[in-house]
Regions:
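Gly/Ser/Thr-rich beta-alpha loop segments that engage phosphate groups in nucleotides
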Residues: 14, 83-84, 111, 120, ...
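Glycine-rich anion-binding loops and their surrounding alpha/beta cores
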Residues: 8, 63-66, 87, 102, ...
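A glycine-rich phosphate/pyrophosphate-binding beta-strand-loop-alpha-helix module
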Residues: 41, 88-144
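A generic alpha-helix surface/boundary motif
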Residues: 18, 35-38, 92, 117, ...
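Acidic, glycine/proline-rich low-complexity segments that act as flexible tails and inter-domain linkers
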Residues: 1-87, 101, 105, 255-262, ...
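Acidic, glycine-rich active-site loops and adjacent beta-strand->loop/helix elements
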Residues: 79-84, 109-115, 154, 220-221
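Alpha-helical scaffolding segments of alpha/beta enzyme cores, especially the outer helices
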Residues: 22, 56, 60, 96, ...
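Beta-strand segments within the central parallel beta-sheet cores of soluble alpha/beta enzyme folds
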Residues: 39, 55-58, 136-140, 217, ...
């Protein structure tokens, strides 16, 4: 099947859902050769991925993953990476605030690819054990309301594609598949992307994958987060319906920050930034966390406004709840 798929892609022809599913199954089972994987990814990149293709690929990744079967609603906050901004770990820090506000967070991520410090690097520096399996993380969700699923542990089938991705050295569909392949099938999600053109298509993909409430965001300064430095494009998902709008920090009482104020460092520096924010340090970094945590709380709890979410995030930090969550 993958040979036929490569032929079609090289002729700029879209794949059917079945072709996309079988091709990804061949890649993730070791059936496809390295040359076939490289050809497939390159031809797909040159053609451009469709919503149906991305949905099918993500479904295969979820099926192949070690999965967490959890009864309650779960929230995921994640970015694609690739924005080359070297910010501190905004989503990771926001995750503690979201969880401390009473929302169960099932975060999924990896070590750094394009920045100095990925989510896994920062959490490791904070003392988090990365190699927890599904049963252990289900227990974490029950006991503390938050878990981290280390991508290599949960997506072992990626081992066939990973060397090819490194050798290719270009963005491929896998750059966007990771955030779409949460092993706990979180049904509420805030996802940041590195390109404006991805916002609405990936919101449709998330909806296809069963996300009931969520949003895909792109900061107009290039961040794959809700930025504190500019406006952010948002495509919100609510029960299969999409709504696109811009979010401006100034509408929530925050002046624009300078991008240099959001820059982080290595994993130890970023871990300390996270500790400082959760302990109540004010400034642009806190504002970035409040925007992302506030939007997440709005998406996770029915009947709130974004301002309500930001207010809850502030209160969660100021009362010490987020700091305590990071020290559990």
């Amino acid at each position: 099947m993958i040979k036929q798929a490569i032929y079609q892609l090289s002729n700029k022809q879209d794949l059917t859902t079945e072709q996309a599913i079988v091709s990804m199954q061949e890649i993730m089972s070791g059936t496809a050769s390295d040359i076939q994987i490289a050809s497939f990814l390159t031809a797909l990149r040159l053609k451009g991925e469709t919503i149906d293709e991305i949905t099918a690929f993500a479904q295969v990744m979820r099926e192949k993953a070690q999965s967490i079967d959890y009864k309650d609603d779960l929230f995921e906050i994640v970015g694609t990476g690739g924005d080359e901004a070297n910010t501190f770990n905004i989503s990771t820090t926001a995750g503690f605030v979201i969880s401390a506000s009473g929302i169960k967070v099932a975060k999924h991520g990896n070590r750094s690819v394009s920045s100095k410090c990925g989510a896994a690097d920062c959490l490791e520096a904070l003392g988090t054990k990365l190699e927890l399996d599904a049963k252990q993380n289900e227990k974490m969700l029950d006991e503390i309301g938050m878990c981290f699923m280390f991508a290599p542990k949960y997506h072992s089938s990626m081992k066939y594609a990973s060397p090819v991705r490194r050798e290719l050295g270009i963005r491929t569909v896998f750059n966007i598949l990771g955030p779409l392949a949460n092993p706990a099938n979180a049904n509420r999600q805030l996802m940041g992307v590195y390109q404006e053109e991805l916002v609405e298509p990936l919101a449709k993909v998330l909806s296809n994958l069963g996300v009931k409430r969520g949003a895909v965001v792109y900061g107009y300064d290039g961040l794959d987060e809700i930025t504190a430095c500019n406006k952010t494009l948002v495509c919100e998902i609510k029960d299969k319906k999409l709504k696109t709008y811009t979010l401006d920090p100034r509408d929530y009482g925050m002046e624009y920050a300078n991008s240099a104020e959001l820059v982080g460092g290595d994993k130890n520096e970023n871990a300390q930034i996270t500790r400082d924010i959760l302990a109540g340090t004010l400034g642009a970094k806190r504002n970035a966390v409040l925007l992302n945590a506030g939007m997440s709380i709005y998406l996770a709890k029915d009947g709130l406004s974004i301002q309500d979410g930001i207010n809850i995030a502030k209160d969660t930090i100021d009362k010490g709840k987020a700091d305590r969550k990071a020290h559990v």
